[in-house]
Amino acid sequence: MGVHLEVLDTGEQLMVPGDVLEEENKGTLWKFLLSGAMAGAVSRTGTAPLDRARVYMQVYSSKSNFRHLLSGLRSLVQEGGIRSLWRGNGINVLKIAPEYAIKFSVFEQSRNFFYGVHTSPSFQERVVAGSLAVAISQTLINPMEVLKTRLTLRFTGQYKGLLDCARQILERDGTRALYRGYLPNMLGIIPYACTDLAVYELLRCLWQKSGRDMKDPSGLVSLSSVTLSTTCGQMASYPLTLVRTRMQAQDTVEGSNPTMLGVFKRILNQQGWPGLYRGMTPTLLKVLPAGGISYLVYEAMKKTLGVQVLSR
């Protein structure tokens, strides 16, 4: 757990496995990346109903049937059947490959730069490296995030598919619509990365004080630590995540374009501070199963592909 980049996919953040970063493992890089991508795909598919409920609660929280998780899920099933709970999952899985590859490449370059300055990167340097990796990957896949949000929220018959959704957005709002929510997305990276890594470092210190070997913790300890730190990071950046989703979901109406501050004010005026945490329940509920599924699938894929992890 020396480098906080475990294989954990919560649906919001896909992290690069730390064992990929060891020099001796570079020859089997494609196997690690394939294992991670498969883990993310299975994880997101398994928790897709909770993710769709989260998006609906964030966007339509003023409607009585989407104020609570169970009533929201019931409404979704009534509108489109059981299969509708997986709307938007296709592109959510599709964007794993570019997200994973970009995040890994940027983090690898940042890591090499900092290792050239120090033997071991400091806390601040790891925050910078991780934040830079997330920022660049999110910049490049933001259009896919917008499409994912629109497809997740679509009602039966609204779009014929991914390409039809993209065409309608471009015809109605232009290319700028594909970067709706970009600013709150970027701003949310800092509190997420700082909180995530700070909690992880705290847990690492507590583990070391217990007198146990920090270099070889059990899978359960590693999974629990990353899950808890990731959850805290999500809570710290959640209001910005909610605003991002609201902005991505909104169409341009009569030439108006929703701004980040405008969405913040609207939420606070209509729902108060609690409104900034709408949809938090399904978000928290999916963290543990998503992390557990991705971890187990990743380990199973490595075993299937015959990967032997070699560390320095």
From Swiss-Prot:
Under the GO molecular function aspect, what terms does this record hold?
Answer: ADP transmembrane transporter activity; ATP transmembrane transporter activity
| Signal peptide per UniProt | none
Cited SUPFAM superfamilies: Mitochondrial carrier
The annotated topology with respect to the bilayer is: Multi-pass membrane protein
InterPro entries named in the record: Mit_carrier, Mitochondrial_sb/sol_carrier, Mt_carrier_dom_sf
- Which subcellular locations apply to this protein? Mitochondrion inner membrane
Q: Which residues cross the membrane?
A: 33-50, 88-107, 131-144, 182-200, 219-243, 279-298
One GO-annotated biological process of the protein: mitochondrial ADP transmembrane transport
Q: Which reaction does it catalyse?
A: Mg(2+)(out) + phosphate(in) + ATP(out) = Mg(2+)(in) + phosphate(out) + ATP(in); ADP(out) + phosphate(in) + H(+)(out) = ADP(in) + phosphate(out) + H(+)(in)
Q: Where are the Solcar repeats?
A: 27-113, 121-206, 217-304
Pfam families assigned: Mito_carr
Q: What does this protein do?
A: Calcium-independent ATP-Mg/Pi exchanger that catalyzes the electroneutral exchange of Mg-ATP or free ADP against an hydrogenphosphate and participates in the net transport of adenine nucleotides across the mitochondria inner membrane.
Q: Which family does it belong to?
A: Belongs to the mitochondrial carrier (TC 2.A.29) family.
Protein's UniProt name: Calcium-independent mitochondrial carrier protein SCaMC-3L
Q: Which organism is it from?
A: Rattus norvegicus (Rat)
Gene this protein is translated from: Slc25a41
